[in-house]
A protein has these predicted regions:
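Helix-rich C-terminal or lid/interface subdomains of diverse kinases
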Residues: 76, 158-235
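ATP-binding glycine-rich loop module of kinase domains
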Residues: 4-36
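Conserved HxN/HPN-centered segment at the entrance to the catalytic loop
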Residues: 44-57
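Hydrophobic "anchor" residues on beta-strands that sit immediately upstream
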Residues: 21, 68, 119, 136-137
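Conserved structural core of kinase catalytic domains
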Residues: 55-97
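Hydrophobic residue at the +6 position relative to the catalytic HRD Asp in the kinase catalytic loop
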Residues: 129-131
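Active-site Asp-x-Gly
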Residues: 135-173
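Conserved kinase catalytic-core helix
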Residues: 44-47, 80-122, 127, 136
Length: 235
């Protein structure tokens, strides 16, 4: 497929303009978009804010390579850009992330028969939320799977905490986003307890992520401590 302007690049994929309405997301290393596309189509049916897909999402109906996904072009800044521009506060960003997690976990699992399992994003942070005129839209579903909601909260918290524990200019605002997110935890999410299975599993996954830099990996222990510090006490 012929592509236009490169709009953005992540750790594993690039996004190209097709026209004013559609973009092409293409994996660089042979990744397969089929599973993520099926989840996005399912979530859209349940009213969750994801980009529209062009054409059927099922693997048997696809005409593009399995590395390519054609989806709605979203107009507006990412939540991270809005935070840096001052159009939303850190407290608002954290609350919106929490709301998106709560809404996602209210949708029944697509495949699992375990009633405790839900669809998980596993990479929900401010740069994966687009602020459009119609509201926030969640992008980048390449890591999605099904499991306990606490794992999704743990991954989001840990991603934020790694930035907040660093010494970059982003540390202070992201710390405030993290604090806001943690105040909105559900009553069963004991994320401040580093012995809880979900947060420990999140740390294990982050440590094993080959896309993380050595400096990011070294921040994991400090990030875990910061989550403990910022999580409000539960009754």
């Amino acid at each position: 497929m012929q592509t236009g302007e490169l709009l953005g690049s992540g750790r594993s994929a690039d996004v190209f303009a097709i026209d004013d309405h559609w973009v092409l997301r293409r994996y660089r290393d042979g990744g397969d978009v089929t599973a993520g596309a099926a989840v996005m189509a399912y979530l859209a049916e349940h009213g969750y804010p994801v980009p529209r897909l062009r054409g059927p999402a099922g693997a048997g109906h696809r005409t593009e390579p399995r590395t390519d996904l054609v989806m709605q072009r979203l107009h507006g800044p990412s939540m991270l850009q809005a935070l840096l521009q001052g159009t939303i506060t850190a407290e608002e960003a954290g609350a919106r992330l929490a709301d998106l997690l709560h809404r996602l976990h209210s949708v029944p699992a697509r495949v699992s028969v375990d009633p405790a399992n839900r669809i998980l994003h596993l990479d929900l942070h401010p740069d994966n939320v687009m602020i459009t005129s119609g509201g926030p839209v969640v992008i980048d579903w390449c890591n999605t799977e099904e499991g306990p909601p606490g794992l999704d909260w743990g991954m989001s918290a840990l991603i934020l905490a790694q930035v907040a524990a660093g010494n970059t200019a982003m540390a202070a605002p992201v710390r405030a986003v993290l604090a806001s997110l943690l105040t909105c935890l559900g009553p069963t999410m004991a994320m401040g307890n580093t012995d809880s299975g979900c947060l420990t599993e999140a740390r294990t996954r982050r440590a094993a992520d080959p896309s993380m830099s050595e400096s990011e990996t070294h921040l994991l222990d400090d990030a875990m401590d910061l989550i403990t510090e910022l999580t409000p006490a539960r009754p």
